[in-house]
Amino acid sequence: MLDLHQIIVSIIIGVIEGITEFLPISSTGHMIIASHWLKIDNENTKILEIFIEFGSALSILYFFHKKILRILKFNINVKKTNTKNLHIILAILPTIFFGLLFYKKIKLLFNTYNVMYALILGGIFLLISEIFKPKKYKTCSINDISLLQSAIIGFFQIFCLYPGFSRSGATIGTAILLGIKRSVAIEFSFIISIPLIMGASFYDFINNMHNFKILDLPIFFIGFMISFIVSILCIKKLLKIINRTSLIFFGIYRFIISGLIYFIN
């Protein structure tokens, strides 16, 4: 019989992930904070978070699947694009390399205090991106993103390994500083997130399989489905919000949350 408390927790964490994944405020950071405040910060929760993150990744894949098919040239009925697979590889390779190299050390950073500092640093970066962005866009289409731009975005994406910094915040902020149109920056950011989130979820699961219990699968599935459904329902609206809202607003929000963490803890 399913435990009601576990079901409620699974739903709460799933909703948090489904909403925060598409905003530059760090979904991982918010899940860590929620787990701590709900007093469920244990090994079992790590497995739950893996399933939940995978759910949001699938929603991104579903939402952008047509664009991804164009980029990968799997669909012969669509117009060919200039964005090659190499752009995606350059954008994700640095994070994969450092993520694997420092995997155990990175996991030691998964606590509320480190998230608090990362929220502040990420907030400062968002402010810098908005204040010092070029007055005119140099890149107005995802097909026009250069290999150099992809590589630079990939380098700054490394900061997302610090829980609480925000992967989308790092990539969107960097892209905007490089003169990439905001809507294009958002689109590219989430397309390159798919292999990273799915790969990280799989690798985390392999490393935490000893904590996996088949009896907990229904709870994990509930979290997965809640995350997927909420993400599907929210993604279009939230992406519009990012496109129309100054990054300064998200930076201020991050400062407020980090302040709450400090005073509550």
From Swiss-Prot:
Record-level GO cellular component terms: plasma membrane
Pfam families, A to Z: BacA
Transmembrane portions of the chain: 7-27, 45-65, 86-106, 108-128, 145-165, 186-206, 214-234, 245-265
GO terms under biological process: cell wall organization; peptidoglycan biosynthetic process; regulation of cell shape; response to antibiotic
Location of the protein in the cell: Cell membrane
Known catalytic reactions: di-trans,octa-cis-undecaprenyl diphosphate + H2O = di-trans,octa-cis-undecaprenyl phosphate + phosphate + H(+)
MF GO annotations: undecaprenyl-diphosphatase activity
Record EC number: 3.6.1.27
Keyword Cell wall biogenesis/degradation recorded: yes
Additional comment: Bacitracin is thought to be involved in the inhibition of peptidoglycan synthesis by sequestering undecaprenyl diphosphate, thereby reducing the pool of lipid carrier available.
Record protein name field: Undecaprenyl-diphosphatase
Organism whose genome encodes this protein: Buchnera aphidicola subsp. Acyrthosiphon pisum (strain Tuc7)
Encoding gene (name): uppP
